Swiss-Prot record:
<dbReference type="InterPro" id="IPR009000">
    <property type="entry name" value="Transl_B-barrel_sf"/>
</dbReference>
<comment type="function">
    <text>Catalyzes the attachment of alanine to tRNA(Ala) in a two-step reaction: alanine is first activated by ATP to form Ala-AMP and then transferred to the acceptor end of tRNA(Ala). Also edits incorrectly charged Ser-tRNA(Ala) and Gly-tRNA(Ala) via its editing domain.</text>
</comment>
<dbReference type="GO" id="GO:0140096">
    <property type="term" value="F:catalytic activity, acting on a protein"/>
</dbReference>
<protein>
    <recommendedName>
        <fullName>Alanine--tRNA ligase</fullName>
        <ecNumber>6.1.1.7</ecNumber>
    </recommendedName>
</protein>
<dbReference type="InterPro" id="IPR012947">
    <property type="entry name" value="tRNA_SAD"/>
</dbReference>
<feature type="binding site">
    <location>
        <position position="571"/>
    </location>
    <ligand>
        <name>Zn(2+)</name>
    </ligand>
</feature>
<dbReference type="GO" id="GO:0002161">
    <property type="term" value="F:aminoacyl-tRNA deacylase activity"/>
</dbReference>
<keyword id="KW-0820">tRNA-binding</keyword>
<keyword id="KW-0862">Zinc</keyword>
<dbReference type="GO" id="GO:0016740">
    <property type="term" value="F:transferase activity"/>
</dbReference>
<dbReference type="InterPro" id="IPR018164">
    <property type="entry name" value="Ala-tRNA-synth_IIc_N"/>
</dbReference>
<keyword id="KW-0067">ATP-binding</keyword>
<keyword id="KW-0479">Metal-binding</keyword>
<dbReference type="Pfam" id="PF01411">
    <property type="entry name" value="tRNA-synt_2c"/>
</dbReference>
<dbReference type="InterPro" id="IPR045864">
    <property type="entry name" value="aa-tRNA-synth_II/BPL/LPL"/>
</dbReference>
<keyword id="KW-0648">Protein biosynthesis</keyword>
<feature type="binding site">
    <location>
        <position position="567"/>
    </location>
    <ligand>
        <name>Zn(2+)</name>
    </ligand>
</feature>
Amino acid sequence: MKNLSSAQIRQMWLDFWKSKGHSVEPSANLVPVNDPTLLWINSGVATLKKYFDGSVIPDNPRITNAQKSIRTNDIENVGKTARHHTMFEMLGNFSIGDYFRDEAIEWGFELLTSPEWFAFPKDKLYMTYYPDDMDSYNRWIALGVEPSHLIPLEDNFWEIGAGPSGPDTEIFFDRGTDFDPENIGIRLLEEDIENDRYIEIWNIVLSQFNADPAVPRSEYKELPNKNIDTGAGLERLAAIFQGAKTNFETDLFLPIIREVEKISGKTYDQDGDNMSFKVIADHIRALSFAIGDGALPGNEGRGYVLRRLLRRASMHGQRLGITEPFLYKLVETVGNIMESYYPEVLEKRAFIEKIVKSEEESFARTIHTGSQFAEQLMDKLAAEGKSEIDGRDIFKLYDTYGFQVELTEELAEHRGMTLDIAGFEAAMKEQQDRARASVVKGGSMGMQNETLAAITEESTFVYGQTALEASLSVIVADNARTEAVSEGQALLVFDQTPFYAEMGGQVADHGFVKNATGDIVATVIDVQKAPNGQPLHTVELSASISVGQTYTLEIETKRRKGVEKNHTATHLLHAALHNIIGEHATQAGSLNEQDFLRFDFTHFEAVTAEELRRIEEEVNEQIWNAIPVVTVETDIDTAKEMGAMALFGEKYGKEVRVVTIGDYSVELCGGTHVGNTAEIGIFKILKEEGIGSGTRRIIAVTGREAFLAYRDQEDALKEVAATIKSPQIKEVPNKVESLAQQVRDLQKENAALKEKAAAAAAGDVFKNVKDANGIRYIASQVQVSDAGALRTFADNWKQKDYSDVLVLVAAIGDKVNVLVASKSSDVHAGNLIKVLAPIVAGRGGGKPDMAMAGGSDASAIQTLLNSVADNL
């Protein structure tokens, strides 16, 4: 059998499908673009949904790709098994309404068995199929597959929600009896038993039905265009071709493991327990690619996933004896492994390393903070008379602070407490269920719209026009084409139009359709792209219209001009962000409306007030410089030579439009813009905020809206000036600072008085010293507002040699709080409070020098105080 590198496998896959007329789709960004249903791109087909649901018609219906993907619903299994990964590559071939079952199976078999390609031994291949799908069974038989190698399975039907669905046929490679120690054989496949012998290497989904959850599967309607969707895991193929026991011994992971060996001084043993090596190798791949694609560690969404991966890998580093940040040192190795197809990791290496190292250092601090949280939590439980740490708190320590359960258990044991393990496991399961639900949620491809997909009439958007005459080509009403319509809403396609269809963050034009006499026959309320790319006008009708007639199309020029100002300002803002906070601040979304703009970008922290001031100033400088805005149409290669910034996730054809603003900004953009930056007038940032982990948002206004914003601020300042009696606005800051200082002085004076009163009260308490068995003790009831005040008493007591033991009791509301502090080696505060607390119907515990408890029987306080001497 051939011995192929992962790069050779990937390239051979793409070359084979190119030979069958497929276009190679580049691997998309791991962060989904315009798809809120997905947290990550999690399969090869995830980026092609627009083709499968018919909302966009591809240039070539035959597509192949190698797609980097992330799935995180089973993070805890990574490192425990031979094949679980967070980041992996899915090789795929796809047919959008072109070839179907016969070609997909025949070509798949050719790729796998032909000496020119993969050259797998035929007797090593097994296939599963849906029992009712005899067409697939017969096709495999016709290709020479033995019936004993064809296994019917009821689970071989692919459907997730409404949308394309159908039977699938899976291909397995038999690794032999060495991987079947109990000699179970083919039953491993027949009974779907988890095993390392029969490895699934490819799944071919025959998408031929529109799934409808409201009807039985037997009543699903056939798709107007049948599709093929396949996926083969590169890591599994590499393990087979390279004779590796697990995926981790392939050229995709082993170089990373070797680097970890150097850093840790430990050795990776293929037959031993190497979970930590595997976790680190897997997680740093996912981290490197995800951060390179613009995702950043944080506390929610995909940022939370990255933070969890990094902390899990870091903890496993500690198990290998690594005490310093080290993950960032592995980024270069990841980049070197993947450079042939994914150069972006090495290109962004410095930035990725910076983020990873910063997170590692932050995690070290978090571990310290987590220890403090745990101590405070146990103090609180002791004060409340509880001795078990709730499962949700254990999970918080695990999830937020990176505390393994064993570490929490050790801390609890020192305080005489136990763990609610069942509650912890329930909280863990809830999180895993949420993760799995989010994956399922994003699976549906959506129902195909046959009517819109069938529109093939040509239509052209005419730049620079606000009104023109056009012939009406298509009317769609009630999801069906018609020749005429007179009321309600309809979708219209003209042979040409001045109306901009919503795209690239620019909202659609609004306006009117007029007849030959100048009467309005329809109001345009939206314009979107049809599946074949034509501008599709949504209109509300006020008169009858007919296909073939000529109409005048007029846009609302005021709306268009406002949108253009904001769109050009967005380009200026994007360039300013690059200049001031870094090249990593790339566009993650935008919205250019008539009266404001919204710009989302990748950044790992809040933009400072000083940075915002500089950004605003730089954008306005470009506006005041009155720079011409020039748009040229050219080919994509020339555009790249011009230095045009392409937005990741946007699909560009061979011909593109390049918008240049002097030498300040050059971007690929299909939108409309002002002719000169001076038309924008003025630019003002209203708000900067985080909208998700690693993503920031700026909301800004231009022109008249910016003037109104400044005026509102001036009015507010005048109101403040009047309130504080400052006749000159310029004196307001000094006057406010003077008032603030007065408040600080009063607060300081108040705190001093409270401290003096507390000291006086403590002095009275500390005077009442008694003796029991040679141990000096103070036992007293005090009047305080909260349990924290008891600790303040104890802190004051520690400063001087008042006594050996201090026992304080306070009735706060309907609860009794007890504190025991000890300086004596003969008295353990935690043990003493366990004896005293039950007297007031409470429980507690703590350290040898300090312990707290909580109770509910205030009537027994004096009894508790009287019993102190008997227990010393």
